[in-house]
Protein backbone atom coordinates (compact mmCIF):
# COMPACT_ATOMS: atom_id res chain seq x y z
CA UNK A 1 0.00 0.00 0.00
CA UNK A 2 1.33 3.45 -0.91
CA UNK A 3 2.39 5.63 2.00
CA UNK A 4 0.31 8.70 2.83
CA UNK A 5 2.37 11.57 4.23
CA UNK A 6 1.58 14.90 2.55
CA UNK A 7 -0.90 15.23 -0.31
CA UNK A 8 -1.29 18.40 -2.37
CA UNK A 9 -4.05 17.96 -4.90
CA UNK A 10 -7.05 19.38 -6.67
CA UNK A 11 -10.16 18.95 -4.52
CA UNK A 12 -13.54 18.14 -6.07
CA UNK A 13 -16.64 19.59 -4.37
CA UNK A 14 -19.62 17.23 -4.27
CA UNK A 15 -22.25 18.93 -2.05
CA UNK A 16 -24.51 15.95 -1.47
CA UNK A 17 -25.32 13.94 1.66
CA UNK A 18 -26.01 10.20 1.99
CA UNK A 19 -23.98 9.15 -1.05
CA UNK A 20 -24.21 5.39 -0.73
CA UNK A 21 -21.79 2.77 -1.95
CA UNK A 22 -24.06 1.88 -4.86
CA UNK A 23 -23.65 5.44 -6.13
CA UNK A 24 -19.90 5.23 -5.64
CA UNK A 25 -19.68 1.93 -7.54
CA UNK A 26 -22.88 0.27 -8.85
CA UNK A 27 -23.47 -3.41 -8.07
CA UNK A 28 -23.05 -4.53 -11.69
CA UNK A 29 -19.34 -3.73 -11.48
CA UNK A 30 -18.68 -5.89 -8.40
CA UNK A 31 -17.89 -9.09 -10.27
CA UNK A 32 -14.17 -8.37 -10.32
CA UNK A 33 -11.81 -9.06 -7.42
CA UNK A 34 -9.15 -6.79 -8.92
CA UNK A 35 -8.62 -3.38 -7.38
CA UNK A 36 -7.59 -1.78 -10.68
CA UNK A 37 -9.89 -0.69 -13.48
CA UNK A 38 -12.79 0.46 -11.30
CA UNK A 39 -12.00 4.17 -11.43
CA UNK A 40 -13.74 4.62 -14.77
CA UNK A 41 -16.94 3.37 -13.12
CA UNK A 42 -16.72 5.50 -9.97
CA UNK A 43 -20.03 7.39 -9.56
CA UNK A 44 -21.13 5.72 -12.80
CA UNK A 45 -24.80 6.69 -12.55
CA UNK A 46 -23.90 10.27 -11.69
CA UNK A 47 -21.16 10.62 -14.33
CA UNK A 48 -22.75 8.99 -17.38
CA UNK A 49 -25.97 9.03 -19.36
CA UNK A 50 -27.70 5.73 -20.24
CA UNK A 51 -25.95 5.77 -23.63
CA UNK A 52 -22.53 5.98 -21.93
CA UNK A 53 -21.88 9.63 -22.74
CA UNK A 54 -20.63 11.89 -19.98
CA UNK A 55 -22.90 14.23 -18.05
CA UNK A 56 -21.09 17.56 -18.46
CA UNK A 57 -22.54 19.03 -15.27
CA UNK A 58 -21.07 16.33 -13.00
CA UNK A 59 -18.01 17.65 -11.23
CA UNK A 60 -15.63 14.77 -12.02
CA UNK A 61 -16.32 15.24 -15.73
CA UNK A 62 -15.09 18.82 -15.60
CA UNK A 63 -11.56 20.16 -15.88
CA UNK A 64 -9.59 20.26 -13.66
CA UNK A 65 -11.55 17.87 -11.41
CA UNK A 66 -10.80 14.90 -13.65
CA UNK A 67 -7.44 14.94 -11.86
CA UNK A 68 -8.90 15.39 -8.37
CA UNK A 69 -7.05 13.71 -5.52
CA UNK A 70 -9.36 14.95 -2.78
CA UNK A 71 -13.15 14.66 -2.57
CA UNK A 72 -15.23 16.93 -0.31
CA UNK A 73 -18.82 16.00 0.37
CA UNK A 74 -21.53 16.01 3.05
CA UNK A 75 -22.83 13.73 5.79
CA UNK A 76 -22.96 9.94 5.84
CA UNK A 77 -20.65 9.26 2.90
CA UNK A 78 -20.45 5.57 2.03
CA UNK A 79 -23.72 4.44 3.58
CA UNK A 80 -25.51 1.37 2.24
CA UNK A 81 -23.88 -2.00 1.57
CA UNK A 82 -20.39 -2.77 2.84
CA UNK A 83 -18.74 -3.32 -0.56
CA UNK A 84 -14.98 -2.75 -0.42
CA UNK A 85 -15.12 -1.98 -4.13
CA UNK A 86 -16.24 1.56 -3.17
CA UNK A 87 -12.83 2.69 -1.86
CA UNK A 88 -11.18 0.65 -4.62
CA UNK A 89 -13.06 2.71 -7.22
CA UNK A 90 -12.18 6.01 -5.54
CA UNK A 91 -8.52 5.06 -5.26
CA UNK A 92 -8.33 3.89 -8.86
CA UNK A 93 -9.86 7.21 -9.97
CA UNK A 94 -7.09 8.98 -8.06
CA UNK A 95 -8.81 9.98 -4.81
CA UNK A 96 -6.48 9.62 -1.80
CA UNK A 97 -8.46 11.70 0.71
CA UNK A 98 -12.18 12.16 1.38
CA UNK A 99 -13.48 14.95 3.62
CA UNK A 100 -16.99 14.97 5.07
CA UNK A 101 -18.84 15.73 8.31
CA UNK A 102 -19.53 12.01 8.81
CA UNK A 103 -19.03 8.61 7.20
CA UNK A 104 -20.72 5.24 7.33
CA UNK A 105 -18.66 3.10 9.70
CA UNK A 106 -17.74 0.23 7.36
CA UNK A 107 -16.85 2.56 4.50
CA UNK A 108 -14.77 4.66 6.92
CA UNK A 109 -12.81 1.58 8.00
CA UNK A 110 -12.40 0.30 4.43
CA UNK A 111 -10.88 3.62 3.38
CA UNK A 112 -8.05 3.20 5.87
CA UNK A 113 -7.49 -0.40 4.78
CA UNK A 114 -6.98 0.75 1.19
CA UNK A 115 -4.77 3.78 1.67
CA UNK A 116 -7.44 6.49 1.58
CA UNK A 117 -7.53 9.05 4.38
CA UNK A 118 -11.10 9.90 5.51
CA UNK A 119 -11.26 13.17 7.46
CA UNK A 120 -14.23 14.25 9.56
CA UNK A 121 -14.74 18.02 9.69
CA UNK A 122 -17.79 20.11 10.63
CA UNK A 123 -20.32 20.96 7.92
CA UNK A 124 -19.40 24.64 7.89
CA UNK A 125 -15.73 23.77 7.42
CA UNK A 126 -16.61 21.44 4.54
CA UNK A 127 -18.58 24.30 2.98
CA UNK A 128 -15.54 26.58 3.24
CA UNK A 129 -13.30 23.92 1.68
CA UNK A 130 -15.80 23.44 -1.13
CA UNK A 131 -15.57 27.16 -1.84
CA UNK A 132 -11.80 26.71 -2.08
CA UNK A 133 -12.26 23.70 -4.34
CA UNK A 134 -14.45 25.70 -6.72
CA UNK A 135 -11.38 27.75 -7.56
CA UNK A 136 -10.32 24.73 -9.63
CA UNK A 137 -6.61 24.48 -10.27
CA UNK A 138 -6.07 27.55 -8.10
CA UNK A 139 -7.82 25.91 -5.18
CA UNK A 140 -5.49 23.04 -4.40
CA UNK A 141 -5.56 21.78 -0.84
CA UNK A 142 -2.73 20.19 1.09
CA UNK A 143 -3.41 17.39 3.54
CA UNK A 144 -0.50 16.92 5.93
CA UNK A 145 -1.04 13.68 7.82
CA UNK A 146 2.16 14.03 9.82
CA UNK A 147 0.96 17.35 11.27
CA UNK A 148 -2.75 16.44 11.05
CA UNK A 149 -3.80 19.60 9.23
CA UNK A 150 -5.58 20.56 6.02
CA UNK A 151 -3.95 23.63 4.47
CA UNK A 152 -6.18 25.95 2.45
CA UNK A 153 -4.98 27.91 -0.61
CA UNK A 154 -4.50 31.03 1.54
CA UNK A 155 -2.28 29.11 3.96
CA UNK A 156 -4.84 28.79 6.75
CA UNK A 157 -4.61 25.46 8.57
CA UNK A 158 -7.47 23.28 9.79
CA UNK A 159 -6.61 20.58 12.32
CA UNK A 160 -8.23 17.16 12.20
CA UNK A 161 -8.31 14.13 14.49
CA UNK A 162 -7.25 10.61 13.61
CA UNK A 163 -6.69 7.42 15.56
CA UNK A 164 -2.93 7.15 16.30
CA UNK A 165 -2.65 3.57 15.03
CA UNK A 166 -4.45 4.35 11.80
CA UNK A 167 -2.26 7.40 11.32
CA UNK A 168 0.85 5.23 11.78
CA UNK A 169 -0.37 2.60 9.32
CA UNK A 170 -1.09 5.20 6.62
CA UNK A 171 2.23 6.96 7.15
CA UNK A 172 4.05 3.63 6.80
CA UNK A 173 1.88 2.33 3.96
CA UNK A 174 0.78 -0.74 5.89
CA UNK A 175 -2.45 -2.62 5.23
CA UNK A 176 -3.61 -5.56 7.38
CA UNK A 177 -1.20 -7.98 5.71
CA UNK A 178 1.70 -5.54 5.91
CA UNK A 179 0.99 -4.94 9.57
CA UNK A 180 1.05 -8.70 10.21
CA UNK A 181 4.29 -9.16 8.27
CA UNK A 182 6.00 -6.73 10.61
CA UNK A 183 5.82 -9.56 13.14
CA UNK A 184 6.95 -12.27 10.71
CA UNK A 185 10.03 -13.16 12.77
CA UNK A 186 8.03 -13.58 15.96
CA UNK A 187 5.44 -15.68 14.12
CA UNK A 188 8.15 -17.98 12.70
CA UNK A 189 9.71 -18.36 16.14
CA UNK A 190 6.34 -19.19 17.69
CA UNK A 191 5.58 -21.78 15.04
CA UNK A 192 8.98 -23.47 15.43
CA UNK A 193 8.66 -23.52 19.22
CA UNK A 194 5.10 -24.81 19.10
CA UNK A 195 6.04 -27.70 16.82
CA UNK A 196 8.79 -28.81 19.20
CA UNK A 197 6.74 -28.37 22.35
CA UNK A 198 3.46 -29.74 21.01
CA UNK A 199 4.29 -32.06 18.11
CA UNK A 200 0.90 -33.77 18.35
CA UNK A 201 -0.71 -30.61 16.95
CA UNK A 202 1.14 -31.01 13.66
CA UNK A 203 -0.71 -33.38 11.38
CA UNK A 204 1.27 -35.61 9.03
CA UNK A 205 -0.77 -36.89 6.13
CA UNK A 206 0.54 -39.99 4.37
CA UNK A 207 -1.04 -40.93 1.06
Swiss-Prot record:
Pathway: Amino-acid biosynthesis; L-leucine biosynthesis; L-leucine from 3-methyl-2-oxobutanoate: step 2/4. It holds the Pfam family Aconitase_C. One of its GO terms (molecular function) is 3-isopropylmalate dehydratase activity. It catalyses: (2R,3S)-3-isopropylmalate = (2S)-2-isopropylmalate. InterPro entries: 3-IsopropMal_deHydase_ssu (IPR004431), Aconitase/3IPM_dehydase_swvl (IPR015928), AconitaseA/IPMdHydase_ssu_swvl (IPR000573), IPMI_Swivel (IPR033940), LeuD (IPR050075). Heterodimer of LeuC and LeuD. Catalyzes the isomerization between 2-isopropylmalate and 3-isopropylmalate, via the formation of 2-isopropylmaleate. HAMAP family: LeuD_type1. This is 3-isopropylmalate dehydratase small subunit. It comes from Gluconacetobacter diazotrophicus (strain ATCC 49037 / DSM 5601 / CCUG 37298 / CIP 103539 / LMG 7603 / PAl5).
Amino acid sequence: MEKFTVLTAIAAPLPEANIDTDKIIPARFLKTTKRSGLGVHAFDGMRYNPDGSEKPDFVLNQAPYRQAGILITYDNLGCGSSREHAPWALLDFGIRCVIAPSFADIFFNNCFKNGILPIRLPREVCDALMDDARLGGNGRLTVDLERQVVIRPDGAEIAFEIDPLRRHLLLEGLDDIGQTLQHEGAIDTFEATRERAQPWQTRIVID
